[in-house]
């Protein structure tokens, strides 16, 4: 069932393979995910689409500095207050009764609602007046254009096990597909919450004995690079690896399933590259090479931005610079195709190599267009 959902989502959401895998793993692991990124990269649309595949109590709210507790946790019961002098909220249909939840602009939450949010996502409880209500939450998804800066929000941010910076579509091929894409996503495969719980239990049975040493090596290696991983986050990450392996149809996890750790172990977006490099050293050096090529591609894109486009047609230094960049892109394309074939031969995941290859090919077309004028 999950494989069908995965396929449906990937067929519609272009260049969102990692985000989809993170979200589905998050649901299997009973954990929470935050997607970061500029407006317009379909963070909200993707989260809604994922939720549409599960027949669950769903709650969604756009958070502002002025969002009140009533809007998230439900209005006060006037009857309880009048008849019994009790301060109780009517929580039905609000966050305390949700199984899947989405808070957009999640880090705009004010201090008055943070403590309640922490109890809900941490302990799955809500303090409703003088009683404690159990919260059936499977996963809470957050979206934000920026990381939190206030200290009081950092503890809340830390409770999102999975983090991902969502980028705009980069490949020429996928931009072309985007033009013809239907406006509305329509799920075909829908599962019940009981199905989710059954899969969660099955995922916990995945054998990780082959990669225990690798898990420890990665943690120690990253900490030697100055990236601290708390014991709690490390323990939860082991469960995430099991769930990712299960998502990949395995009963026994292998080094390829360590890839999910790339979206767990960083705190600042600048750490993502360093974390990925260390993990790929153990799990998949083909993907590690592709990541290095993406860094080079980003630098070439920045070089193009600095060029005066109007002067390229004059055939001077700007034209020669574009030719030089095009030569590098041609070389990268040839190398990435070779690396992709080697990854396939070695039975290693090659999706990241393919993604970067498409990005290179797309940018190559753009540079060729500049040279043609």
Swiss-Prot record:
InterPro entries: AAA+_ATPase, ClpA/B, MoxR, P-loop_NTPase, RavA-like_AAA_lid, RavA_ATPases. It comes from Methanocaldococcus jannaschii (strain ATCC 43067 / DSM 2661 / JAL-1 / JCM 10045 / NBRC 100440) (Methanococcus jannaschii). SMART domains: AAA. It holds the Pfam family bpMoxR. Transmembrane segments: none annotated. This is Uncharacterized protein MJ0812. One of its GO terms (molecular function) is ATP hydrolysis activity.
């Amino acid at each position: 069932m999950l494989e069908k959902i995965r396929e449906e989502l990937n067929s519609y959401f272009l260049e969102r393979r990692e985000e989809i895998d993170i979200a589905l793993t998050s649901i299997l692991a009973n954990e929470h995910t935050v997607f970061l990124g500029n407006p317009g990269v379909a963070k909200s649309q993707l989260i809604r689409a994922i939720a549409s595949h599960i027949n669950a109590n769903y709650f969604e709210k756009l958070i502002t500095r002025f969002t009140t507790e009533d809007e998230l946790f439900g209005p006060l019961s006037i009857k309880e207050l009048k008849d019994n002098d009790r301060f109780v909220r009517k929580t039905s249909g609000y966050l305390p009764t949700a199984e899947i939840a989405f808070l957009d602009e999640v880090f705009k939450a004010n201090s008055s609602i943070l403590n309640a949010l922490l109890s809900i996502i941490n302990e799955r409880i809500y303090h409703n007046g003088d009683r404690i209500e159990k919260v059936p939450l499977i996963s809470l998804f957050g979206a934000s254009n920026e990381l939190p800066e206030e200290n009081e929000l950092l503890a809340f941010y830390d409770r999102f096990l999975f983090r991902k910076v969502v980028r705009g579509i980069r490949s020429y091929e996928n931009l072309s597909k985007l033009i013809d894409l239907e406006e509305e996503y329509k799920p075909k495969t829908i599962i019940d919450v009981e199905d989710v719980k059954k899969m969660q239990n099955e995922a916990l049975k995945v054998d990780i004995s082959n990669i225990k040493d690798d898990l420890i090596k990665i943690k120690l290696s990253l900490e030697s690079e100055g990236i601290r991983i708390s014991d709690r986050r490390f323990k939860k990450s082991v469960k995430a690896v099991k769930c990712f392996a299960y998502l990949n149809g395995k009963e026994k996890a292998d080094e390829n399933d360590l890839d999910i750790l790339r979206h767990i172990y960083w705190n600042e977006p600048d750490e993502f590259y360093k974390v990925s490099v260390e993990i790929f050293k153990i799990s998949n050096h083909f993907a590690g090479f592709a990541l290095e090529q993406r860094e080079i591609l980003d630098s070439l894109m920045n070089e193009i931005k600095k060029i005066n486009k109007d002067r390229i047609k004059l055939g001077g230094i700007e034209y020669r610079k574009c030719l030089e960049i095009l030569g590098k892109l041609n070389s990268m394309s040839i190398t990435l195709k070779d690396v992709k074939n080697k990854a396939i031969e070695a039975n290693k995941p090659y999706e990241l190599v393919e993604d970067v290859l498409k990005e290179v090919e797309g940018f190559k077309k753009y540079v060729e267009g500049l040279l043609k004028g």
